[in-house]
């Protein structure tokens, strides 16, 4: 019998629980606020986690933002219901908590601030005065946890309908449909729901007009083809000029983070595919890497290269759709049909390897579902010989077109400061001249072993620059795939680890303890050690991350999913004010988003 597993149980785990006291920022905080001003939490997140007092939040945030090498981006902000958490040794007493994840580009380091809250006092000052992109994150945290952010400019629901009762991510809120009463939609309730969707400008701080004229308010979406999904944006117009606008999201919200609390660590993998439904295996990568940190698993070299290969195939697939639909939004129809021919070749290859097309659910904790099939290298070779010429034809026929350039150059332009303020990542950030791609800056899954370049813009991110960067990213992904083809390691496709992989059959037939453990792992799911882990990756649309909290159970205590599209849609008003409606259509096409990635 061929052994397709490697025994890693006796090796030193790659991820140790660390407090990161050696990180320079801890010393800087202690020098400024005193050695006893906060509690440092040891985790497997890979970043310092610091509990601070609520009264210090704004002062600490301002201090970090003004350091010589500042923490310039609020990467994520959300909450947690701590009431049922049993493993909290050494942490401040808390019924709920709010965390703030900050990034320093200059240091290439992060810090996570946490604030403990009592159930009878769920108040914390708004962070919007320091980071404008805290707006949506605070609205979502209030919506799903009921935590109030004092001073927030418009604290209202964002994911759930305005008529919703309760806060779904609380532990006392039902997680299964069978725990609810049967759904009924009466005429009165339908009228109430429709009334709640009526846009009232005063609720958003907008005026209906000036002394001399009235503004027009236009609904774009939630079913407009240029909205790229179930997404509404309300425009305040002075003629064709956009005075202001309000993006309205949540129509595609499926409770993905709540589902993480009721699925085993293994059975949640198919849900990750559907967060950004064009990304396929790219979505699975941060989740399985975060779980592997919790378990202390190091995967074989072959697994790393296979994962990179599948991720880059899906990156090309997503970028082709993005580029062709952008061209279509500007007014040219033909390229989108050419792109679907190319994408079909990728799907044929993906299906041959994984058995599925869009949502493979193929990565596994500790490896992949099965080894590469015979002939995979021939299919990949054929695609690599085909694609470069096609890419050149897209660029020559459409992207160098004078009309397309005129419609997109200088439109929805912003610089590095604005990109960082709004949490922009991916091509939108790199177009401003900031060279930050997680595959290079913080390599994962063996990306450090590949030779490829990161395309960077000249200082201003506009619609055309963002698209052309993705064209170059396609070429770099082809370089990576060429190296995967020529340097695929031999060896197993999964780690022999008791938390993830069933044992060989002969072992279960000889050792009763092995059989019992196998039975429990399959029926209940693996029990991950109580800890916290975090993993970010360079996804197709920007940085995607999973922040997992284990309470020593078969299921995640808290699954936080940070997606790039959410931040990018929040930036729309700041980037498009003063432009025309036709410019907005081009801008929406240049963002590269799908609403499942926004709403989760």
Curated annotation (Swiss-Prot):
NDH-1 is composed of 13 different subunits. Subunits NuoB, CD, E, F, and G constitute the peripheral sector of the complex. This is NADH-quinone oxidoreductase subunit C/D. It is found in: Cell inner membrane. It comes from Escherichia coli O157:H7. Keywords: Cell inner membrane, Cell membrane, Membrane, Multifunctional enzyme, NAD, Quinone, Translocase, Transport, Ubiquinone. It catalyses: a quinone + NADH + 5 H(+)(in) = a quinol + NAD(+) + 4 H(+)(out). In the N-terminal section; belongs to the complex I 30 kDa subunit family. PROSITE patterns: COMPLEX1_30K, COMPLEX1_49K. InterPro entries: NADH_DH_suC (IPR010218), NADH_DH_suCD (IPR023062), NADH_Q_OxRdtase_suD (IPR001135), NADH_quin_OxRdtase_su_C/D-like (IPR037232), NADH_UbQ_OxRdtase_30kDa_su (IPR001268), NADH_UbQ_OxRdtase_49kDa_CS (IPR014029), NADH_UbQ_OxRdtase_CS (IPR020396), NDH1_su_D/H (IPR022885). Signal peptide: none annotated. Residues 1-190 are annotated as: NADH dehydrogenase I subunit C. It is an enzyme of class 7 (translocase). GO terms for molecular function: NAD binding; NADH dehydrogenase (ubiquinone) activity; NADH:ubiquinone reductase (non-electrogenic) activity; quinone binding. NDH-1 shuttles electrons from NADH, via FMN and iron-sulfur (Fe-S) centers, to quinones in the respiratory chain. The immediate electron acceptor for the enzyme in this species is believed to be ubiquinone. Couples the redox reaction to proton translocation (for every two electrons transferred, four hydrogen ions are translocated across the cytoplasmic membrane), and thus conserves the redox energy in a proton gradient. It is a peripheral membrane protein. SUPFAM superfamilies: HydB/Nqo4-like (SSF56762), Nqo5-like (SSF143243). Its EC number is 7.1.1.-. One of its GO terms (cellular component) is NADH dehydrogenase complex. Residues 214-600 are annotated as: NADH dehydrogenase I subunit D. Pfam families: Complex1_30kDa, Complex1_49kDa.
